[in-house]
Amino acid sequence: MYALIKTGGKQYKVAAGEKIKVEQIAADVGQEIVIDQVLAVGSGADLKVGTPLVAGATVKATVVAHGRHDKVRIFKMRRRKHYQKRQGHRQNFTELEISTVNG
């Protein structure tokens, strides 16, 4: 059984036992969270699509770790004007382990 969930402004396809990295969630490591924004639930050929959410569907996950992604480097330049700007960014993430998909 799999589900399409929405968290942090993004959508993820998840199944029980998978680990995913999502936008940072304010939860402690080891804490179990319940995601109720489930857009679709499927099992084999059977698929339930919500309008926009599937009623009563939930996904339970455990927070495994918090961390930061690799640095993304931004470089802006205007040719012939000697304008160069360098910038970097590291996005925070939360790693979740999906325990159950209900729906």
UniProtKB/Swiss-Prot annotation:
SUPFAM superfamilies, A to Z: L21p-like
Keywords: Ribonucleoprotein, Ribosomal protein, RNA-binding, rRNA-binding
Transmembrane parts of this sequence: none
GO terms of biological process kind: translation
Listed Pfam families: Ribosomal_L21p (PF00829)
Molecular function as annotated in GO: rRNA binding; structural constituent of ribosome
InterPro entries according to UniProt: bL21-like, bL21-like_sf, Ribosomal_bL21, Ribosomal_bL21_CS
Gene Ontology CC: one annotated term: ribonucleoprotein complex
PROSITE patterns: RIBOSOMAL_L21
Family indicated by similarity: Belongs to the bacterial ribosomal protein bL21 family.
Classification via PANTHER family: 50S RIBOSOMAL PROTEIN L21 (PTHR21349), LARGE RIBOSOMAL SUBUNIT PROTEIN BL21M (PTHR21349:SF0)
Role description: This protein binds to 23S rRNA in the presence of protein L20.
UniProt xrefs under HAMAP family: Ribosomal_bL21
Subunit structure: Part of the 50S ribosomal subunit. Contacts protein L20.
Protein name: Large ribosomal subunit protein bL21
Source organism (scientific name): Methylibium petroleiphilum (strain ATCC BAA-1232 / LMG 22953 / PM1)
Gene (name only): rplU
